C-alpha cells in the first residue's frame, strides 16, 4: 500500500550534493526505501528545471555561504509545489538561517542516521514536515517568512495578508 500511495503522487527525490559513491549509495537506498524516483545533482552546478512535486534534499556539508545563497535564490523562484529538506545540517546552524530557506519542509542534522532520514522523508511524502520540536516552535512563533504555501493563500489580497500576519503575531483591534 505504501508503494501505491507514492507512485500515485508522482514525487521525485532530488539529492543535491557533491557526487560521490557515498551519495549514489544514499540515493539508491532512499529510492528503494521510499519507492520513489530520484536523481543526483552536483551542488556546484546550476539547475534550471525542477519538476513539480519534487522533494529536494540539499546536503549542507557540501555547501558554503556562496552556494547556500545561490540555492536559496534559485529555489525561491520556483513555485511548483516543491519541498526542500536540509541534509547533514550542522547542529549550530542558526534557526534564523533555516527560516530563510524557501519551501522548507524539514531539517536533518549531521548526527541523524539513514533510518531517521527515511522516516522523516516518509512523513514529508504524507504531507508532514520534519523539524525538531524546538525548531518547529521557533518557526511558528518567530518567523514571518515561514508560511504554508497553498493556492488558497495566493488568492488573498495584500491587505488581507497584512491583517492575517498582524493577527498571527497577536495584534487586535
Model region roles, listed by residue range:
Residues 101-102, 145-147:
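Short glycine/proline- and charge-enriched loop/turn segments
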Residues 147-173:
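Helix-turn-helix DNA-binding segment
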Residues 1-138:
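N-terminal regulatory/sensing modules of transcriptional regulators
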Residues 140-142:
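Preference for well-ordered, secondary-structure-rich cores of eukaryotic proteins
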Amino acid at each position: 500500500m505504501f508503494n501505491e500511495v507514492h507512485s500515485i503522487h508522482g514525487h521525485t527525490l532530488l539529492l543535491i550534493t557533491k557526487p560521490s559513491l557515498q551519495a549514489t549509495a544514499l540515493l539508491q537506498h532512499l529510492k528503494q526505501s521510499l519507492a520513489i524516483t530520484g536523481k543526483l545533482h552536483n551542488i556546484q552546478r546550476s539547475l534550471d528545471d525542477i519538476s513539480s512535486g519534487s522533494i529536494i534534499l540539499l546536503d549542507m556539508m557540501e555547501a558554503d555561504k556562496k552556494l547556500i545563497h545561490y540555492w536559496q535564490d534559485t529555489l525561491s523562484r520556483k513555485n511548483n509545489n516543491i519541498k526542500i529538506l536540509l541534509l547533514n545540517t550542522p547542529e549550530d546552524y542558526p534557526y534564523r538561517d533555516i527560516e530563510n530557506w524557501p519551501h522548507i519542509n524539514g531539517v536533518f542534522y549531521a548526527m541523524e542516521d539513514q533510518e531517521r532520514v527515511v522516516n522523516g522523508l516518509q512523513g514529508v511524502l504524507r504531507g508532514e514536515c520534519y523539524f525538531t520540536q524546538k525548531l518547529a516552535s521557533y518557526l511558528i512563533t518567530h518567523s514571518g517568512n515561514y508560511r504554508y504555501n497553498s493556492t488558497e493563500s495566493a488568492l488573498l489580497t495584500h491587505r488581507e495578508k497584512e491583517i492575517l500576519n498582524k493577527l498571527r503575531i497577536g495584534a487586535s483591534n
